[in-house]
Structure formats: structure tokens, C-alpha cells
Amino acid sequence: MEKLASLYHHHLATLQARAQTVLARHQLDALLIHSGELLTVFLDDHDYPFKVNPQFKAWVPVTQVPNCWLWVDGVNPPKLWFYSPVDYWHNVAPVPESFWTEEIDITVLRNADDIGQLLPSQRERVAYIGYAPQRAQDLGIRADNINPQSVLDYLHYHRAYKTDYELACMREAQKTAVIGHRAAHEAFLSGMSEFDINLAYLTATGHRDIDVPYGNIVALNEHAAVLHYTQLDHHAPSDVRSFLIDAGAEYNGYAADLTRTYSAQSDGAFALLIKDLNQEMLALIDTVQAGVRYTDYHIQMHQRIAKLLKSHQLVRDISEEAMVEQGLTSPFLPHGLGHPLGLQVHDVAGFMQDDRGTHLAAPSQYPYLRCTRVLEPGMVMTIEPGIYFIESLLAPWREGELCQHFDWQKVDALKPFGGIRIEDNIVIHDGRVENMTRDLNLA
């Protein structure tokens, strides 16, 4: 904990420096960052699960408490109004005492509506960051200072560069997720249903289903062809062929995002395809370095997918280069290579080229790529190639001048397996890449 306290001290200094810069640039006095508010279910008396403002948890690891406020001026210690009501109906989070609290000026807020009386009275040059704009208006924040885009652009852009504290938190999230993945794999081998595999994952990680950073994808057989499958059947299929799990964890608000695919049989075409895709993925990661645009690695992965499709005789009589140029790899890999990772699973500013918000869209050929930035030290990315057998994407290729290049018998034989996705989380360093996932020996 002492090490984390030291890392947090330097993390806070970095955030303070960023705050000073953005406040001076936009002639603002302070940022007022709101943790968020509870949203009540329509025509009911209970609330949706609370999700904290990511810009709030960047400063303090308070992730489950609504109605908290941070006042940041970049010079003085950030002031936190921590919501702790007198309430016997609901659990009330204790006022924090942890590795980070000596750095923050904490005041207890008993009544959420009292915040207006407690904030500094001069708010004409204060920017509100949060998802309750009406609350900001009620506090006297000017309309053009409610989530000002230029301020958000600056904050989002620099969030790509993780501090050592953030990297430490993300490594802890990896450890938890890896424990869950191993438990889920054992549950799969024992013949459990998707629903029960998911329970095994949550139990092993100590998460509730509302605590994981995104809805777990636990897919058997053809369900793996649905990229964001979250149905969770209660009954295992009579013939189990494959298992894809895309599931993460959180630590102090920072996410892990891991995917693995397994074959029920250790031999056969599908098992070999998993093995070979894994090798191509690791080979690609070995080439990753700072100074290269992420888009280039996405295109390189399509070239590697073309190589696999040819070597497994799913596509024939056409060069690998022509396969990529003609788009034959796209129905097998319809999503991007990966995305920035951090406080959010799909972390912000993947397309942002500078801290003033200059946007570089994904290439038209690959519209679902989530990052076009040049990789730099401190960035954390996912690398998650896949090969899927999705009929709605394959159907247009069953006719036309290129259809003869597909071995449809072999393609159709793999459709009952759904597809493959393998995902690691990597850190870009100066001169090397850290694979946080493989460092924990998750094969």
C-alpha cells in the first residue's frame, strides 16, 4: 500500500499539471467534477446500477458513490465532498481512509442538495464535468461551461498516457481477470452452461455482474459468432464444440479486458485454427513499437488473417495481398484489432491526434477500428484479432466473381464453432512492449 501511495502522489501531480494547463488555456478558475447521480427506473421506486463519471475516478478511486464532487484548480489539494448520508434504507459507504486520502481535502456531504451552499460562491469561470447538466445549471454554472468540448478534448487526449499508478492498477485488474478466466475454463471443461460459467467467473473474481467493466461474453458453439453475445443460456448444449469468453475486471476504477477461445476437442480443424491465430497474434505483438500508427497494425493483422485463411484452405487460388485488397478477410475479421484501455474499456480519444481534438477517422475499408493514433510510451491497448463464421457476413460472398475462392464446404464445417477471438492487454514502453496478460501466464 505504501508503494501505491507513492505512485498515487505522482499520479495526482500529473493530473494537477494537466488541470493547470487546461484551466489557463481556457481562462477558467476550476473544474467541478461530479461523480454522478442515481437514475430511478421509470414508474418505479428503485434505481439503475450506478456508474461513476470516468473523469471523476481518474482523480480518486471512488467508484460506487453518487453525489460526490471534486473541486480542482491545479494548485491547491483537490477538494472532495464525499456523500455520506444518514440512511437506514440503503448501505452508506464509509468516509474513505486509504492510501490516497492524505492527498485530498475531504468534507462529508450529508445531504446531496446542500452542495450549492458548500461550493465556492464564484462559479462564473468554473467548468462542470459530469452527466447531470441540469444540476450544473442549478448550481449557477454557465451553459457554455457545462462539459465544454475543448476542455474534454484536452483531458481525454492526455488520458491515453497512463501514469505509473494507473499501470499498477491495471496490472492488478489483470490479475483478477486471469483468475476469473481460469475458473471459467474449468467450468467449461466440467460441462457447465453459459450461465453457470459466468457465475464461476464472477465468484472467482469477487465481482457482481454490475461490477465488471462490461457485460461478460460467455459463448458456447455458434453463440461465439455474435460479437457481443450476452444471452447466457441456462442449459448446456448436448454437443459442446467451442467456448469463447470475453470478460474483464476492475481495480480502483481501471479495467482489464481479456478474451480466450477454446475447442472442446484438442485436435481437429478448429483447435488448429485457434493455435495458429494465437501464434500470429503473438508475432504481431512482437512487432509493436512506439512511433507507429495503430492503423498499420490493424492492416498487418488482416495480412496475417489472409495467411491463415490460405494455410487452412478456407480461401484458395488468390494471393494474400489480393485477399486483403479485395476485402476477403473482412467477413472473417469484421471488427478492429483493438482499442485504448483504461478508466473505460473502450477508452476515450482513440481517434484524437492532438489535445485540441483533431480527429482522424478509421479507414473506410475498416469502419469499426477504434483507434487511429500513433502509439507512444504510456499507452495501453488491446490486441484482439478474431476469425468468425458469421452467415450474414459470409452470405454476400457466396455469389459473384470471387465466390470460387472460398472453400465453402470447409467454411460451413466451421460455422457450428461460431468463431475465435483472442485478446491481450499491452503497454507501450520506450523500446519495448509489456504484455500484461501473458506475463500472468494466461495461455
UniProtKB/Swiss-Prot annotation:
Which species does this protein come from? Answer: Pectobacterium carotovorum subsp. carotovorum (strain PC1)
Q: Which branch of life, at top level?
A: Bacteria
Q: What does this protein do?
A: Splits dipeptides with a prolyl residue in the C-terminal position.
Indicate what this protein is called per its UniProt record.
Answer: Xaa-Pro dipeptidase
PANTHER family per the UniProt record, alphabetical: XAA-PRO AMINOPEPTIDASE 3 (PTHR43226), XAA-PRO DIPEPTIDASE (PTHR43226:SF8)
Q: Which UniProt keywords apply?
A: Dipeptidase, Hydrolase, Manganese, Metal-binding, Metalloprotease, Protease
This entry carries the following GO cellular component terms, namely:
cytosol
**Binding residue positions for Mn(2+) 2:** D246, D257, E423
Family affiliation: Belongs to the peptidase M24B family. Bacterial-type prolidase subfamily.
Pfam families, alphabetized: PepQ_N (PF21216), Peptidase_M24 (PF00557)
The prosthetic group or cofactor this protein requires is: Mn(2+)
Name the chemical reaction catalysed here: Xaa-L-Pro dipeptide + H2O = an L-alpha-amino acid + L-proline
Name the Gene Ontology biological process terms: proteolysis
Q: How is its cofactor bound, per UniProt? A: Binds 2 manganese ions per subunit.
What are the EC numbers? 3.4.13.9
Point out the signal peptide segment: none
Gene name linked to the record: pepQ
As one GO molecular function, the record gives:
aminopeptidase activity
Binding locations of Mn(2+) 1: D257, H339, E384, E423
| Entries under InterPro entries matching the protein | Creatin/AminoP/Spt16_N, Creatinase/aminopeptidase-like, PepQ_N, Pept_M24, Peptidase_M24B_aminopep-P_CS, X-Pro_dipept-like, X_Pro_dipept
